[in-house]
Every structure is written in structure tokens, then in C-alpha cells.
Amino acid sequence: MLFRSLDRTFVDGRPVDVQEEIVWERPFCNLIRFARDLPASAPPQPKLLIVAPMSGHYATLLRGTVESFLPHFDVYVTDWTDARMVPVALGTFDLDDYIDYLIDICRALGADGAPVHTLGVCQPSVPLIAAVAVMERAGDPASPASMTLMGGPIDTRRSPTAVNTLAERRGPDWFARNCIVRVPFPYPGFGREVYPGFLQLSGFMAMNLDRHVNAHLEMFHHLVEGDGDSAEKHREFYDEYMAVMDLDAAYYLQTVETVFVRHALPKGEMRHRGELVDLSTIRRAALMTVEGEKDDISGVGQTQAAIDLCVNIPQERKRHYLQLGVGHYGIFNGSRFRKEIAPRIREFISDAGRVRARSAKSGEVVA
């Protein structure tokens, strides 16, 4: 079981067993469903696709995110494969492939006609909104009913952070020369060019060193004071935070250039398989953006930019929420997320589902 301890949840106040199922597979991703043992008479709950970041950490970093939504949704999460474990013969993986994967997953989940709601945590915000734009332009019936973008770099020109400034100043060529290595023997991906996860982790840790030291001190204080729950939650999060994976070099370098150097998406210059990604084609999906006041990875306003760029989504189906007092990881993990952010996302998805259901019943297209 990938997500340890997520073997039970509560639905309508009753304990329900949970099992992980792999329902879709590709070389660089498995789609995990958290199948709940609900009675046959239970009404179906909305499908929620949580797109985990491909940024050096495993999907298990989202344990708290998944746990918060399990009582209310049929939850799926992308489990990205460590690039060092993918044989070179299976090809590379770039930003175009990422978007293709998300489109294929949405089609697989929407095959039964039920609406699919999507949630992109941090880095996936760009490929997710691009995938929705591609699907809506094509009139794809499986295009999501809603998308929630959390702490994502939609437009890094707004409130640029140290991460954004470094990427723009160095440029993709510098990263290619200094950060790309080949997977060593005896890993299955021997010879594959990758951006190693330990570089990402060391960069984040150095950026927030005082915060991490203080967090560990607080954990030990909790242990001394007998606050076992808080200390244990902190320990679990750090176990996941310290576990890192390698990224395919093609994806990493294309992301640096497209998102952080050229700002191609907000400029209307981003392409997928040679075709422009036009966010004005998005009309049917509802949109919510979530940011953290103290986020030093995706600055305030970077995710909210999606609200301005999606000009043809009616204003009443667009929402933005800024959570005070939290940084990047507090957007999707911790007590503020559970008490303040998750309930707002649930309400947003519920409203979006009702709009899509009314549209389907009347035979009209939401616009």
C-alpha cells in the first residue's frame, strides 16, 4: 500500500474501509483510486482527480490532502514514476506528454459520463489548465467539470520568488549544463538523462533552512510536552518530504523554459503538440485558485492569474481564496488546510457539479 495508514475513512459518520487500486497505467504514471467499501445503496459521490506535483517528491506527500477529501469524493491521485526506474527504451517524458497523460486520464474517468473534478497541487497547475484548454477546444465530452489550482506557477512574473528569479536569470541552458545527470547502473533507467531529486530537495531546504530547523525543534518540544499527535504528524510529513525522485530531463528543462523563463502560458505563446494553448477556449469548467500568504515558491498572485486569463468562464463560476498565515506546503497540508481550505474546495466542487448536472439534464452547453 503506497499511502500507509489510509486504509479507513468516515463517510456520513460511519467507518469505511479503503483500498488502493491502480486503474490506469503508463510508463511514467500510475493512477491510484482509493476504493471505499460503501454499501450498494450509497449514492455515488463526485469523482475527484488530484494531480500530484512532478517536482521531486512522491505523491505520498499529499497524504493529508487525500485524507481530507476521502469522506466526500471518489478520489484518484496521479502516482508519478521515479524516472530512474523507467528504462530508456520506453522513451522520454516532456511537458507535452504530461498534458497528454492528463487528457487520457480525464477521458478514462469520464468514460461512464459522470463529471470529473480536478485539483492540481502546485506544479501541475500549468499542465492541468493546458489540458483542460485542449479538451475544451476539441469539444471533448470528458473535459472536467471543475479545476482547482493550488499554489501553481501560472504567471511567475507576479510576485516573483527566489525560485522564479533564479530560473529566469540562469535560463534552461545553465540548468542543462549543471543539473542534468545520467542514471547510473544498476537502476532500470540506466543511461536516462534526469534532474536528480536530491538537487530539488537540497535547494528547497537551503531556501528555508531556518524554518526547517525551527520545525524540528518544535517537534521535539511537542514530544516533551506530550503532544504526540502534533509531533507524529510533523514526523510523517518530513518522512515524505525527505523522500525524493528523479525527473526526466526533457520534462524538467521544458518546464523551466516554458513556465519560468518565457512565461509562455500567460503570454498566450504556450504550445501543445505544435498548437497554441488558448485559455479563452475554456468555457464549461468552473475554476478555483488557492494561494498561501507566505508562499515563497509560488508567490501571491501567480495562481490567481488563471482567473484573469480564463476570460470566457463566467465570473460566478470563478473563485479565488488566499489563506493567511501559511506557506507553500500549508496550502495542501496541516490544520489550516483541513479547517479553512478543504471545506471551501468541497463547496466549490459541489456548486460546479450542480451546474454541470443542470446543463446535462437540459441538454445545454455550459457557457
Give names to the regions the model predicted.
Residues 119-121, 125, 292:
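Conserved alpha/beta-hydrolase "nucleophile elbow" surrounding the catalytic nucleophile
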Residues 297, 321-339:
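Catalytic histidine-centered segment of alpha/beta-hydrolase-like enzymes
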Residues 296-305:
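Conserved alpha/beta-hydrolase "acid-adjacent" motif
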Residues 282-283, 288-291, 295:
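Short beta-strand/loop motif that positions the catalytic acidic residue
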Residues 6-86:
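Short, surface-exposed "cap/lid" segments of acyl-processing enzymes
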Residues 85-89, 99-116, 128-133:
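Conserved acidic catalytic loop of the alpha/beta-hydrolase fold
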Residues 112-113, 131-250:
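Alpha/beta-hydrolase-fold enzymes
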